Structure formats: structure tokens, C-alpha cells
């Protein structure tokens, strides 16, 4: 049996849709259930940020996780495949009536992705104060907590609704298939078979 960690929300639905096409089974989680067993697969419903931990520690053989999470945490996993679902961007956001001021001695950036933010602004030789937040990040520049934010953006509508605009795009992100290193050795044939079946479906699901 292969255990697969999925992120809650749309990416999980899109991933299960791929499995339905491949195997012809329903692959539906019962209401509020966090585990789904179907055929040779056990799916776990997990917070996106926790998936690298589940896979790294061996609680899951395989996981589906955003590239932004991989770049933020750099987990020790095997990166198998870009699934081309869950597409989004990591962007710098600022108030509509402002511009990023690189002449400041220090920029205050509110984000839940401090490593991505730090690496990006380091390339611009800009001193940074990171303000780590876990939600409502758009609020930070509006109340003077930060000069700007670094956050995941899908359509940009949330920023617009809160009086912010995209100043710069740091990276493009989409969901990736990853594997535990030990599982990739012990269950290599099963994981590679799954990899090839999913890869065949990707052009049809974009």
C-alpha cells in the first residue's frame, strides 16, 4: 500500500480527479474524514505546510505539495513531478498608493514565508526585518506593521479588495509530487508505476 499525503482544498480535489481518471474508482473522502483507503492507496488529508513533514518522517510515502512550500522549507525528499495544478505566484504586495523603496535602511516584510522573502531581498542587497504572520497578512501594511508583504497570490483579488497591489513576482508555483527517500527505495516499483501513470494524465488535466 502507498500512503499519499494531500493538501486540504482544491489541490486535493484536482489530485483525486487524476486518480479517478487513472484507476476508475471514486476516491472520495467521507465528510470530515482525514483518511481515505481505496485499493492499494491510503490518502491522508493534511495542511499544505505539514506535507513535507509527513513525507520526510515516513508517515506518508508520497505527497502533493506546492513548490512554494518546498522552496520555503527545502525538505529532504525526492522531487518527482510538476503536476501543473494549484498554480499560483509568490508576490510582493504593497499599498496601492506606494512603491517599494529600496533606499530605506531596512524594509519590513510581513510573511508566512520568511526564507523565500529573505532570499529574494538578499539578491537585491536589501536589509530586511521579517515579521512572521500566520494569517490576514494583507492587514500588515494597512496598519503600519510592515512596508510590504510576501504572500501566495492566485488571482490577486484578495490584495485588491484590501487596497494592495502586486509590486513584484518572486516565483511561480504549482503542486509537485514528492516521495520519501526510503520509500522511494523500498517501494520504488510501485511509486514509479504511479509516477508514470500520473505523468500520462498531466497534459489532459491542464
Curated annotation (Swiss-Prot):
It comes from the Bacteria. Keywords: Amino-acid biosynthesis, ATP-binding, Cytoplasm, Glycosyltransferase, Histidine biosynthesis, Nucleotide-binding, Transferase. Pathway: Amino-acid biosynthesis; L-histidine biosynthesis; L-histidine from 5-phospho-alpha-D-ribose 1-diphosphate: step 1/9. One of its GO terms (cellular component) is cytoplasm. It is found in: Cytoplasm. One of its GO terms (molecular function) is ATP phosphoribosyltransferase activity. Its EC number is 2.4.2.17. CDD domains: PBP2_HisGs (cd13595). InterPro entries: ATP_PRibTrfase_cat, ATP_PRibTrfase_CS, ATP_PRibTrfase_HisG, ATP_PRibTrfase_HisG_short. Belongs to the ATP phosphoribosyltransferase family. Short subfamily. Lacks the C-terminal regulatory region which is replaced by HisZ. NCBIfam families: hisG (TIGR00070). Catalyzes the condensation of ATP and 5-phosphoribose 1-diphosphate to form N'-(5'-phosphoribosyl)-ATP (PR-ATP). Has a crucial role in the pathway because the rate of histidine biosynthesis seems to be controlled primarily by regulation of HisG enzymatic activity. HAMAP family: HisG_Short. This is ATP phosphoribosyltransferase.
Amino acid at each position: 500500500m502507498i500512503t499519499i499525503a494531500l493538501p486540504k482544498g482544491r489541490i486535493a480535489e484536482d489530485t483525486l480527479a487524476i486518480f479517478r481518471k487513472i484507476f476508475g474508482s471514486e476516491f472520495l473522502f467521507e465528510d470530515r474524514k482525514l483518511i481515505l483507503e481505496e485499493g492499494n492507496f491510503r490518502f491522508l488529508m493534511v495542511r499544505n505546510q505539514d506535507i513535507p513533514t509527513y513525507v520526510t518522517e515516513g508517515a506518508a510515502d508520497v505527497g502533493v505539495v506546492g513548490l512554494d512550500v518546498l522552496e520555503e522549507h527545502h525538505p529532504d525528499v525526492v522531487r518527482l513531478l510538476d503536476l501543473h495544478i494549484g498554480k499560483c505566484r509568490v508576490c510582493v504586495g504593497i499599498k496601492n498608493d506606494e512603491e517599494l523603496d529600496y533606499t530605506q535602511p531596512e524594509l519590513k516584510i510581513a510573511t508566512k514565508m520568511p526564507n523565500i522573502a529573505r532570499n529574494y531581498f538578499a539578491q537585491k542587497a536589501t536589509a530586511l526585518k521579517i515579521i512572521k504572520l500566520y494569517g490576514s497578512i494583507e492587514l500588515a501594511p494597512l496598519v503600519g506593521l510592515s512596508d510590504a508583504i510576501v504572500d501566495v497570490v492566485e488571482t490577486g483579488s484578495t490584495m485588491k479588495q484590501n487596497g494592495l497591489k502586486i509590486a513584484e513576482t518572486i516565483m511561480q508555483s504549482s503542486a509537485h509530487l514528492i516521495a520519501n527517500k526510503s520509500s522511494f527505495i523500498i517501494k520504488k516499483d510501485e511509486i514509479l508505476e504511479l509516477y508514470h501513470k500520473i505523468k500520462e494524465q498531466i497534459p489532459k488535466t491542464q
